[in-house]
Swiss-Prot record:
PANTHER family hit by this protein: MITOCHONDRIAL TRNA-SPECIFIC 2-THIOURIDYLASE 1 (PTHR11933:SF5), TRNA 5-METHYLAMINOMETHYL-2-THIOURIDYLATE -METHYLTRANSFERASE (PTHR11933)
Keyword Cytoplasm assigned: yes
Name of the protein described by the UniProt record: tRNA-specific 2-thiouridylase MnmA
GO CC list: cytoplasm
Catalytic activity: S-sulfanyl-L-cysteinyl-[protein] + uridine(34) in tRNA + AH2 + ATP = 2-thiouridine(34) in tRNA + L-cysteinyl-[protein] + A + AMP + diphosphate + H(+)
Span list, region Interaction with tRNA: 150-152, 312-313
Subunit details: Interacts with TusE.
Enzyme Commission number(s): 2.8.1.13
BP term (GO), one: tRNA wobble position uridine thiolation
Site annotation Interaction with tRNA: residues: H129, Q345
Length: 371
């Protein structure tokens, strides 16, 4: 008998392939496994309702196939209060938040973890995230997933070592093609299902239309960094630094046909600033200040240290020096300038495979100060 046979694991079943295979792998490891489908959004239209109903049906079909129970829970109120309202407030303030990080912090590894432990008697929860856990000296570390293309540690940096100690990540040890292969061998309904993109639980939809339901559009001018009016935007909230598509402006006689990129947002004048070329000096930063820090080991940083940072998901590692400003903020200086560092997004720090933690980008240090 496996030592795991007395341990109960609740898997967050999303109706996708990663959580499906996670449940199977845990069964193979000898755990008592059940699923939990979380409903975190009250749908507004038929299309959304259909998508959520399909996900639930797929999760149920997988659980039936694997011979395990599926529980359901509604966290829509928690999601609205702790994720969505903050998400809207950030957009209103001209920043670009990452709702998936908030959702993991408030829902998947808080509300779900508490519900699984208290209501379902779970010893552990499990998710289909591509990350790994390593236990060293009685503390759990968060490691990058084995599949570098799929590593999701960027989204989980807010977790504490205590939360990680109660969590299992079976597919973090595998590469994505292997996960699909296992699902196909088991003839799971999710084997060929497309990976979900879009906002956490809100799903795939036209982002501009969605945001427009909750925040009124505030049109304003699009200006070049040289002060030339080149167009009109429908609202600063629809744009993010480094964005190229959806600006509705072509080349100019002076600038030729190089594409335009968003390089700044002036909230006071409701102006979107653009420049041509993805390495325009105004788009580059030499560092940043991060706030709302979360360190996985929960030890405050007291001295400068070297590491690498990511300022967005799937970005190349950026070598940097991190210096504490106070308990809540750090100063980060890159070895080389970096494009499109975006306030509101997260800066996540690593040493080798270990995810140390991270924070929200409060401000960036531009390569060139505006005249």
């Amino acid at each position: 008998m496996s030592d795991n046979s007395q341990k109960k694991v609740i898997v967050g079943m999303s109706g996708g392939v990663d959580s499906s295979v996670s449940a199977y792998l845990l069964q193979q490891q000898g755990y008592q496994v059940a699923g939990l489908f979380m409903k975190n959004w009250e749908e507004d239209d038929d299309e959304e309702y259909c998508s959520a109903a399909t996900d639930l049906a797929d999760a149920q079909a997988v659980c039936d196939k694997l011979g395990m129970e599926l529980h359901t829970v509604n966290f829509a109120a928690e999601y609205w209060d702790n994720v969505f309202e903050l998400f809207l407030a950030e957009y209103k303030a001209g920043r670009t938040p990452n709702p998936d990080i908030l959702c993991n912090k408030e829902i998947k590894f808080k509300a779900f973890l508490e519900f699984a432990a208290e209501d379902l008697g779970a010893d552990y929860i499990a998710t289909g995230h591509y990350v790994r856990r390593q236990d060293v000296d009685g503390k759990s570390r968060l490691l990058r997933g084995l599949d570098g293309n799929k590593d999701q540690s960027y989204f989980l940096y807010t977790l504490s070592h205590e939360q990680i100690a109660q969590s299992l990540f079976p597919v973090g040890e595998l590469e994505k093609p292997e996960v699909r292969r296992i699902a196909e061998q088991l003839d799971l309904v999710t084997a060929k299902k497309k990976d979900s993109t879009g906002i956490c639980f809100i799903g795939e939809r036209k982002f501009r239309d969605f945001l427009g339901r909750y925040l009124p559009a505030q049109p304003g001018p699009i200006m070049t960094v040289d002060g030339q009016l080149v167009g009109k935007h429908q609202g600063l909230m629809y744009h993010t630094l480094g964005q190229r598509k959806g600006l509705g402006i072509g080349g100019t006689k002076e600038g030729g046909d190089d594409p335009w990129y968003v390089v700044d947002k002036d909230l006071d004048s409701n102006t979107l600033l653009v420049a041509q070329g993805h390495e325009h000096p105004r788009l580059m930063s030499v560092g940043l200040v991060a706030q709302q820090l979360h360190w996985v080991d929960r030890q405050p940083v007291t001295a400068p240290f070297r590491c690498v940072v990511k300022t967005r998901y799937r970005q190349q590692d950026i070598p940097c020096t991190v210096t504490p400003l106070d308990d809540e903020r750090v100063d980060v200086r890159f070895d080389d300038p970096v494009a499109a560092v975006t306030p509101g997004q997260s800066a996540v720090f690593y040493q080798g495979e270990i995810c140390l933690g991270g924070g929200i980008i409060e401000q960036r240090y531009p390569l060139t100060n505006p005249a």
